[in-house]
């Protein structure tokens, strides 16, 4: 596997990647505002979008000590950003990282993963979909949202209805 030999083999053998993602968090990032920019463009063009949330390979996650709790919290935060604005076509595969052959490496889908995606993409593309109705909210550009700790998501949802 080219990815393994060129990118991971040496690092794995020396142990440099062991626990290296222990303090990594996807939940607090300016990229939530970047994502909002994409969503605004989809809404402006009235584009019906199917979002796919892929898993992380569970063995990789364990080896690098990437927090399962943090990944679930990221999942909740991105779902809220999407669904609160009317983006309801979401294929959430984030719980499939432990399924054999679902992933080919750390973050890339394997044949089972692509089969799962195809089973959702095919009907989305081949069947008539209802016209989307988006209600965009500029609060997702705010630093408050970008840096919102997952522990405050429920409170944020209540105060920003």
Located regions from the model:
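Extended hydrophobic/aromatic segments used for targeting, binding, or gating
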Residues: 27-33, 38-104
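C-terminal regions of proteins
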Residues: 76-161
């Amino acid at each position: 596997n080219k990815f393994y030999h060129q990118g991971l083999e040496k690092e794995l053998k020396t142990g440099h990647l062991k626990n290296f993602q222990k303090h990594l968090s996807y939940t607090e990032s300016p990229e939530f505002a970047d994502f909002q920019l994409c969503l605004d463009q989809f809404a402006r063009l009235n584009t019906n979008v199917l979002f796919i949330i892929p898993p992380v390979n569970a063995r990789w996650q364990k080896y690098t000590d990437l927090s399962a709790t943090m990944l679930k919290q990221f999942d909740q935060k991105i779902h809220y950003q999407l669904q609160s604005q009317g983006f309801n076509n979401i294929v959430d595969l984030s719980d499939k990282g432990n399924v054999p052959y679902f992933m080919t490496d750390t973050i890339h889908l394997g044949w089972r993963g692509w089969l799962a995606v195809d089973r959702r993409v095919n009907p989305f593309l081949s069947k008539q979909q209802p016209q989307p109705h988006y209600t965009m909210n500029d609060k997702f550009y705010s630093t408050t949202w970008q840096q919102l700790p997952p522990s405050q998501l429920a409170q944020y949802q209540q105060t920003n209805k």
